[in-house]
Regions:
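Glycine-rich, acidic/polar active-site loops that bind/position phosphate-bearing ligands
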Residues: 341, 431, 444-465, 469, ...
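Residue-level detector of anion-binding/catalytic polar loops
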Residues: 231-232, 303
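FAD-binding subdomain of flavoenzyme oxidoreductases
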Residues: 263-274, 280-464
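N-terminal flexible segment immediately upstream of the FAD-binding catalytic core
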Residues: 2-224, 241-280, 309, 435-436, ...
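Glycine-rich, histidine-containing beta strand-loop boundary motifs that form or position
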Residues: 235-239, 246, 258, 286, ...
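Flexible, glycine/charged-enriched surface loops at secondary-structure junctions
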Residues: 180-189, 304-309, 392, 399-407, ...
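Generic non-transmembrane alpha-helical segments
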Residues: 171-182, 221-231, 296, 460-471, ...
Length: 527
């Protein structure tokens, strides 16, 4: 048994395996200088400074900045920027990469053209040095020579990339093909472009390969093979996240798309460890869309508590990895509170099954101690077949919530509990079993519009919550959901004012009040 302590020493699933000083970190560094756009073919949001740093390094950008004021014709600068533009447009376009991989002659013509431009720059440097042999002329020639050498290095690296990519694709196809169908190993431009970002629209690097396994059983082998190939593994479901968790930060990354893992079980009464009575639950694969689970629960007369705004597109695996909530979280908590069991693959390529004991069928912070049984199974076998080890994890219930805040999205460690709220950093969620609930018989929805200063209306949220929490303790009405909409959101959705005032509200609160006593619900609504 272990209790919550420091984080275990495990590799990070979606962190770059090799540090690249001119890679993603340099690309996303704050750019305080003017965003000059002299590099041609740059249709991206990267500035010239960011591109030069990625391709040539910080020193080269400093030299270019110093030489900018000494230009006469600017022809050498234009040729250098053309070289960088050609390299950049290929690196940022998987379709061009595939075309050049398939056409060695065309690729060689491009590389020769890049070398020709650099040779012309060197000729102009020597001519300028012959004409201006003074100290400023020699310094200028020295800077140009340094830039030419750096650019030749970039061209050589660019030329080598194609052979390296082709070789890595051959190795990856062979290794990954042992774990899944070859049709599920995608190197094509469409797949890579489709997985370069999530709902953030933040683009850093294109992934090397996209994997679309057919079954849960294939995941463990794929993760193990990816790490043996030196690839960073990035789990991805519906791609609806707003934290950038599915955004590749290294070109040597493998995105594992779990959308085919769409097994959805029937609602059934299940015996949970430490619970005296059977509990309604539902099993779902990581790729099941949240809406499908919600509808399956409703069809059986139950409620699925996890209802993020993205429920029509988000997937179950992402709900676990993000500890998703929604409006019903007020009543039953977030994903963590409603999980009875989940399975994942850890960075070692082994199965990890987490089972909650003594489930209170409510918010986890309401109990003194939450207990989780962790079981690791050999990834070379079917899930649950060959046990490696097990342990019991005990965590104080209050540890999962921050006082005065509730869910703390900055707490990724979450007391050492695997999978939940980790955004895929400690493993890939493959399936889960959820506790379902019964909605009280009567429901009323209240819409409150506020027309004064927004800051004066904010305390009403706390007052409503406190009032209804107090009534629920006395067996009365319960607050099932409370949603706050600010003026900007209201205007974006074209909100129609409900009151007779000739003004647009600064804030709207929408609350669901529920209970088994119709009179109590009506009284709370009037209050």
């Amino acid at each position: 048994m272990r209790t919550a302590a420091g984080p275990p020493n495990r590799p990070n699933m979606n962190a770059p395996q090799v540090f690249d000083p001119h890679g993603a970190a340099a690309a996303v560094a704050a750019d305080l200088a003017p965003r000059l756009r002299e590099i041609p073919y740059n249709y991206t949001s990267f500035s010239d400074r960011e591109i030069v740093i990625r391709l040539l390094g910080e020193e080269a950008w400093a030299a270019l900045d110093e030489l900018r004021g000494e230009r006469r014709t600017g022809r050498s600068a234009r040729m250098l920027y053309e070289v960088l533009g050609d390299i950049w447009v290929v690196r940022r376009n998987p379709y061009l990469q595939d075309d050049l991989l398939d056409n060695p002659k065309r690729r060689q013509m491009l590389i020769d053209a890049l070398g020709h431009r650099l040779a012309e720059i060197d000729k102009r440097r020597q001519a300028d040095l012959s004409e201006h042999g003074d100290e400023p002329g020699r310094e200028r020639a020295s800077r140009v020579a340094m830039l030419t050498v750096a650019a030749r290095g970039a061209v050589d690296a660019f030329a080598r990339e194609f052979e390296q990519m082709a070789e890595l694709r051959r190795r990856a196809t062979k290794a990954l093909g042992r774990c899944t169908q070859k049709d599920n190993i995608r190197f094509d431009g469409l797949a890579r472009v489709s997985h370069v970002t999530d709902a953030t629209d933040w683009r850093v690097e294109y992934p090397f390969v996209i994997l679309t396994p057919d079954t849960e059983a294939e995941i463990a082998g794929l993760i193990k093979a990816c790490f043996e190939l030196g690839l960073t593994v990035i789990p991805r479901g519906g791609g609806t996240g707003y934290t950038g968790g599915a955004v590749p930060l290294t070109p040597f990354s493998a995105v594992i798309n779990t959308e085919k893992l769409e097994q959805l079980g029937a609602v059934e009464l299940t015996e949970l460890p430490g619970v005296a009575h059977k509990v309604p639950t539902i099993f779902s694969g990581a790729g099941v869309v949240t809406r499908r689970v919600t509808e399956a629960a409703e069809a059986a007369g139950y409620v699925f508590a996890v209802d993020p705004t993205s429920l029509d597109a988000s997937c179950i695996g992402g709900n676990v990895a993000m500890n998703a909530g929604g409006k019903k979280a007020v009543l039953w908590g977030t994903a963590l509170d409603n999980l009875a069991w989940w399975r994942m693959v850890d960075p070692d390529g082994n199965w990890l099954e987490v089972t909650r004991h003594d489930h209170n069928q409510g918010k986890i912070h309401d109990i003194a101690v939450a207990r989780f049984e962790l079981k690791w199974f050999d990834g070379a076998h079917a899930p649950g077949e060959k046990l490696i080890r097990s342990e019991m994890l005990e965590i104080e219930g209050k540890r999962f919530r921050k006082e005065g805040l509730g869910k703390d999205v900055t707490d990724k460690f979450l007391a050492g509990l695997p999978g939940v709220q980790k955004e895929g950093c400690d493993g890939l969620i493959t399936s889960a079993r959820w506790v379902l609930h019964k909605m009280p018989a009567h429901t009323r929805t209240v819409c409150l519009e506020f027309f004064g200063q927004a800051r004066e209306a904010i305390p009403s949220i706390v007052e409503i919550k406190d009032y209804l929490f107090e009534t629920s303790k006395q067996g009365g009405a319960i607050l099932a959901g409370l949603e706050h909409l600010d003026e900007r959101y209201l205007r974006a959705v074209g909100y129609a004012t409900k009151s007779k005032r000739n003004a647009f509200p600064k804030m709207v609160l929408i609350g669901d009040i529920v209970g088994d006593d119709a009179d109590a619900v009506a009284a709370a609504t009037r209050k």
